[in-house]
Amino acid sequence: FFIPLRPYNVTGLDKLRILLDTVQPELPEIDSEMREYPEISTVINNFVKTGKKIIFTMGKGGVGKTTVAIKVAQALQKQGKKVHLATTDPADHLNFYLGATSGLSLSHIDEEKELREYKEEVLSKARETMSGDDFDYVKEDLESPCTQEIAVFRAFAEIVEKADDEIVVIDTAPTGHTLLLLESTQSYAKEVERTSGEVPKSIQKLLPRLQNSDETEVLMVTLPETTPVYESMRLADDLDRAHIAHTWWLVNQSMSATH
């Protein structure tokens, strides 16, 4: 038994009913005019030409963001650029693909480690000026669910700060997780100040840096399928609202160039 390949998206009852039929409906002829689709090297050369320092790969889960991030980082490295490749995705695949001999500087946000270190830092500062009930209140406050998000956010800001000295390529988690991180920048900064008493420079500079189109670019990664494309369209709208630049879409598994 096998499921045949059909030249249409199997969405809706009508398409489900005809999926396994021997006789398939005739399809209208598609305009097969050859178009010039730039290759990924064109995108990378544009990043170099425009002096981008922070490059995100974003899109739905499973569209190939990690693979694209690695290709971009390796290509920039071949052009003599100092590159740091990072991932905010809890499913860290960078080491699996690259190993220890890639020559790239790698980092991964380990949520449990970041949470532990953030708690230790806040409590250490609290011990210097507090005791008794006040200290217990701070300790209890750190058990709130948002503490882990703040710890991850702080680590994210520290990764972005590396762009002072090198190009940072960031392989992001699936769309929703990343947008939450970006959209909450200001509120997280206030929460960091409330709990630790100060806002690190990396966090102060984060939002202006992400919104600087001369420095930051989002490379949208998708597949030639309905759901990934619609999700990328929604992502584009969200990025527009956040004032974060996105010029390029990279479509994986596309057969358009084979005509």
Where on the chain are the PLM-derived regions?
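Long, charge-dense
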Residues: F1, E112-K119, Y188, V192-R194, ...
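C-terminal lobe/tail of nucleotide-utilizing enzymes
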Residues: F1-K52, Q211, E215, T226-H259
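Conserved nucleotide-binding/hydrolysis micro-motifs of P-loop NTPases
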Residues: R6-T11, P90-H93, E111-L115, P174-H177, ...
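Basic, amphipathic N-terminal segments
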Residues: I18, L27-E29, E121-K125, T129, ...
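Short, structured motif recognition centered on aromatic/hydrophobic residues
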Residues: I54-G59, T67, V72-L76, H84-T87, ...
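Walker A/P-loop NTP-binding active-site region of P-loop NTPases
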Residues: F56-E114, L182-Q186
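Conserved catalytic network of the ASCE P-loop NTPase/AAA+ motor domain
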Residues: K78, A100-T101, V160-A163, L210-D214, ...
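Phosphate/Mg2+-binding loops and adjacent switch elements
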Residues: T129-T226, E231-R234
